[in-house]
Amino acid sequence: GMIHRDGGPAIEWADGGKSWYKNGKLHREDGPAFERCNGDKEWYKSGGLHREEGPAVECVCGYKEWWSNDKRYGKNNDFNNESWQVFIKTLIFS
């Protein structure tokens, strides 16, 4: 069957990483869907990298990537959380 779990990670890796799945796709509404053991985090919606509040990829080293609907629009300081939210609204309403 499809990997799926409501209310917690569907996979808890031996190294301490965690993955949230819904209907077989990486997905989480209220946080990163993939938390690596080193602290790196990735936000997914229905299997694609996506985050409206900030970067969809946040690495402990400080590296960031800005994604919407599985398309990368920037990295690191191309946006900050405020400018990203403004940009996302222009994408949605264009």
Question: Which functions belong to the PLM regions below?
Answer:
Residues 2-94:
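Glycine/tyrosine- and acidic-biased, solvent-exposed loop/turn segments at the edges of beta-strands
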